[in-house]
Amino acid sequence: MVKFFTGSDADKAGDYNLSHIDLINHNGDIIDLKYIVIEMNIYESIYKNAVTGSIVITDAKNQIGRLEVQGLERIAFKLSSPGTKNVEDMLDASVETGEPFHIYKITDRKQIGPGVMQYTLHFASREFMRNLRTKVSQAYNGRLDIAVRKILQEEDYLDSRKKLKYEKTGNSNKIVIPNLRPFDAINMIANQSLPEKSDGVGYYFYQTIKCFHFRSWDSICLLYTSDAADEAS
């Protein structure tokens, strides 16, 4: 059950503040979902290249039923835990100060009452959508973490504005990307990457709600250590 709180109303374990949640269609029209969302899930994992999520909606006005998903629809919201004051501890997917998620499919359509439909909207980060529409055909020389940063940030590829937290690679190879999607290209580079300061083999490229990471398993286990640097997007 999605709960909307203001101020000190959200004080129980598992509660959170979700001040608004809007669907923005490809024409820029805004549909207020605040009171028809019954469930919201956000997924992140070191085994996933992008953050994804889903919301379950009960729709008595057929607002979503008329929506043809074109990959341009967005979900905008702000999510925080009770008592959170630091902006960096919030999930800001608002239009004004953050980056909304993109809807990529609708599933589980069913009628649950007279004139009432229920749907699940699946959404993902902007980079997830860019990955579906872009290919990389490029040769890279030098440190492999630099190649990853280029694929993540350059306009021709993922064009991400999010921060990348990375561990420098110890090997500098020439690598040729043979017309792959950006995530596949980065995963290929990750498999060939060697840490600069440990004996591990292979890196993980993943997204959290705050940023992207490119680091070895040892670095993940040690969390943020002195050999992990921050690169602003």
Report residues per predicted region.
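Assembly/oligomerization scaffold segments
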Residues: 1-133
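Generic beta-strand structural signal
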Residues: 117-121, 173, 210
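Acidic/histidine-enriched alpha-helical segments
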Residues: 204-216
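Amphipathic, non-transmembrane alpha-helical segments in extracytoplasmic/periplasmic proteins
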Residues: 54-55, 123-124, 132-161, 177-205
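Single conserved hydrophobic/aromatic residue that forms the stacking wall/gate
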Residues: 224-232
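Short, conserved phosphate-binding/catalytic loop or strand-edge motifs used
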Residues: 125, 160-173
